[in-house]
Amino acid sequence: MQEWLEILLIHTLIDSSSLSPQRLRVMNRIISSQGSDLIKQKLSQHTSFFGIKLWILITASASIAFLLVLIISVLLCFIFHRRRCSQEPFRLRSKLCLPLSHIPLTNKQQIPYNRCGDDIESQRISQVGWSSARLSYYTRSFSSTGSFGSFNVFTFMEIKNVTDSFADDNVITKGDSSTVYRGILMGTVTVAVKRFLPSNSRYEDKDFITKAEMIANVRHKNVVRLLGYCIEGDERVLVYEYAEKGDLHEWLHGSAGRNRPLTWRKRMKIIQGVAKGLAYIHEDIEPKITHQDIRPSKILLDYQWNPKILDVGFIGHSDIPTLIPSPGNMDEKIDVYSFGNMIMELVSGRVSVDQSSPHVRVYLVDWIKEMVANHMIVDVLDPSLPEFPTIKELKRIVLISLRCVDPELKERPKMGDVIHMLQPHDLLLNNNAIQKAQKITRSHEVSAISIRQ
């Protein structure tokens, strides 16, 4: 320390103008060297804090301070984002509903929308405005595991842009009461847009909305999810999640099935998935819902061949979709019968009612029963199958289908029981069940003979 003071004293007393530049550079170098050595000496000294060196203590303190600032910043950003998600209205409808040609939307409406997908224990209904002609805004936010995070209300202009003004190229299927179109949301997300014919739009807005919102709460892997709706004037539109493989009817009786027939394993996967979906809506939710129109065209298939039941809670043959709570088990038994008939279509590859011959209708259920009664069960198999099941497996599946189409309602199993029956070693498929199926086929044979006489 004394050497350092002496150098400073010399430096201040001597007139720098009398020194040559070379001597000044030497003196500055000496001063810098002395100062550097002093700093190193101080930093290398042990402190009273557990004897840690000063430079280590300073470095550790700076690192801890930096981490604390970083953590606090991240927490503040997260809290701000959560508050913003739960409070701000959704103002990105133009980005959500991009048309296929990416034309910007006009006359956009701001609709409350939960983009975060957070769990909401108490569901809330946000009703912003009503008019005599139509419902202006109405949305219900709830927890979602899908891409959008809540139930959506679309304007008809948005629906038109999503489907390119309902272009014929986007038609997926046409029915007696509606047409289903392919649409694009957010420029990349494909959806199915179901537009009902104007003749099916005479019901009040509140009724349609209540039914749609109840169906939106149905969440199951084997049920097509309802993403939102549109209601303006006479227009009634439902927006569903999209299934990449199309409907089962196309794979059984259309061009897709002729080019690439479904394997036995895929058919069994479809049967099991539909059974689980029906058991869910029959037994696991309140109010219970029945479908009443189970058929291959109502079963959609995703890219992994998982079946998804379409139009859950809506009667397919009515003028407008109507929610049907099941007061008893009669409606459920109708679904069980339709499910058994669908199994027969999957096993045989035949349509439910064959009208290829003029003035003759051949019902698949009757044909299967006749083949079983005549011990020709092998002949019921779809000849286009890439590989055939074992006789034991075939008998098991046909037996299940026969139990489902039992003429006696009380003898038809519940869908929950059917799921157990589909397991390879289920106790429900015992000798008594086999005798019951044989009794059904024999009674059918007797009735058929009496009709001929």
UniProtKB/Swiss-Prot annotation:
ATP binds at I172, T173, K174, G175, D176, S177, S178, T179, V180, K194. It is a single-pass membrane protein. Residues 166-428 form the Protein kinase domain. GO terms for cellular component: plasma membrane. The keyword Transmembrane applies. The chain crosses the membrane at residues 60-80. It comes from the Eukaryota. It holds the Pfam family PK_Tyr_Ser-Thr. The active site is at D293 (proton acceptor). GO terms for molecular function: ATP binding; protein serine kinase activity; protein serine/threonine kinase activity. Its EC number is 2.7.11.1. Gene3D superfamilies: Phosphorylase Kinase, domain 1 (3.30.200.20), Transferase(Phosphotransferase) domain 1 (1.10.510.10). It is found in: Cell membrane. The modification Phosphotyrosine is found at Y240. Keywords: ATP-binding, Cell membrane, Kinase, Membrane, Nucleotide-binding, Phosphoprotein, Serine/threonine-protein kinase, Transferase, Transmembrane, Transmembrane helix. The modification Phosphoserine is found at S297. It catalyses: L-seryl-[protein] + ATP = O-phospho-L-seryl-[protein] + ADP + H(+); L-threonyl-[protein] + ATP = O-phospho-L-threonyl-[protein] + ADP + H(+). The modification Phosphothreonine is found at T155, T322. Belongs to the protein kinase superfamily. This is Putative receptor-like protein kinase At2g30940. The lineage of its organism: Eukaryota, Viridiplantae, Streptophyta, Embryophyta, Tracheophyta.
